[in-house]
Design a protein with these regions (language model features):
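Conserved beta-ketoacyl condensing-enzyme motif
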Residues: 1-92, 120-131, 238-260
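Short glycine/threonine-rich loop-to-helix capping motif typified by GTGT followed
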Residues: 211-223, 253-271, 291-299
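Condensing-enzyme catalytic core mediating Claisen C-C bond formation in acyl metabolism
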Residues: 145-248
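A beta-strand-loop signature enriched in Asp, Gly, Thr, and Trp
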Residues: 230, 234, 238-250, 260-287
Length: 305
């Protein structure tokens, strides 16, 4: 997945990677990428943990392929040959954003001129499904049928799988997805010098902790600060009128009842603070599912179009 995803990113760059390498030093490239949960399939930690139970032996590759930062290592070793900074910041389903923040800061500080930001995760394994099901986070057939009946939808043919994940309105849970998303950040002057195809910019990335709270997984004040800070930065760039009339939100929108209520409240409070009376909100997980680490990357690339 990493190789295919990174290959697609290079193909959309608008110039050859050789031209980039001929212009900058190899140590001016940084790569921040990885998974959130770790690969629990038979090739990674799954195979490692199951081998003794199955009466077989673990492969020498199981442990290495299960590590969360392996996608960055694959990019450095097999695709770019980079000798620059490399790393990965794990933050559950905000992992891509954490890496994006590191990438932005690396360019701003001058420690890198080109940064690869991404993530790859394949969380559809029995163990991960069981874990989320135990948390009542997953949509399942029984609850889907109940919701369809409640909404006066046809239940004669069973659950409507295409609508298993409903980020907005009445919903019963999320659907897992698999994804590999990579973007290439460049120093402004370098992008213009090389004639790279520019899709957008990253003027603001924020991440804040929640302070004291009784539940680690529950939302807290940090979520409000994070969104409000980015909206404030957007207002500085666009102006108040454009912020209020020409912006939209690409929401996390997992499809769980908890996310529906908490994220809606965050957006509503921030909108009131900045005088936004009507704020279009969309989400992509009803089509792609929740891919964990690359989830924010799914949102970013679909927003760019």
């Amino acid at each position: 997945m990493t190789v295919f995803g990174m290959g697609d990113a290079l193909g959309q760059l608008g110039l050859s990677w050789k031209k980039v390498m001929d212009t900058i030093s190899p140590d001016q490239i940084a790569v921040f990428s990885g998974a959130a949960i770790g690969q629990l399939d038979v090739f990674g930690f799954g195979g490692l943990m199951q081998s003794r139970i199955k009466g077989s032996r673990a492969s020498s590759k199981n442990l290495a392929l299960g590590l969360v930062e392996m996608s960055a290592d694959f990019i450095n070793a097999y695709i770019l040959g980079s000798v620059g900074r490399s790393g990965h910041n794990v933050g559950a389903c905000a992992t891509f954003l954490y890496n994006l923040q590191m990438g932005k800061e690396a360019i701003e500080s001058g420690s890198a001129r080109v940064v690869i930001v991404g993530g790859a995760e394949a969380p559809i394994t029995p163990e991960i499904v069981d874990g989320f099901f135990a948390m009542s986070a997953l949509s399942d057939d029984k609850r889907m049928i109940e919701l369809q009946a409640q909404n006066n939808e046809d239940i004669s043919k069973g659950p409507i799988q295409e609508r298993a994940c409903r980020p907005f309105g009445n919903n019963v849970g999320m659907v897992l997805g698999e994804s590999a998303q990579f973007i290439i950040l460049m120093e402004d002057n370098l992008a213009l010098e090389l004639g790279a195809k520019i899709y957008g910019s990253v003027p603001s990335v924020a991440s804040h902790s929640d302070g004291y709270k009784s539940s680690i997984s529950g939302p807290g004040v940090g979520n409000y600060i994070t969104v409000a800070r980015c909206v404030a930065d957007a207002e500085k760039i666009l102006g108040t009128k454009q912020l209020r009339n020409q912006t939209f939100v690409h929401a996390h929108g997992t499809g769980t009842p908890a996310n529906r209520t908490t994220e809606s409240h965050i957006l509503n409070e921030v909108a009131k603070t900045y005088g936004i009376s009507s704020w279009p909100v969309t989400g992509i997980k009803s089509f792609l599912g929740h891919s964990m680490a690359p989830a924010s990357g799914d949102q970013l690339v679909t927003a760019l179009g």
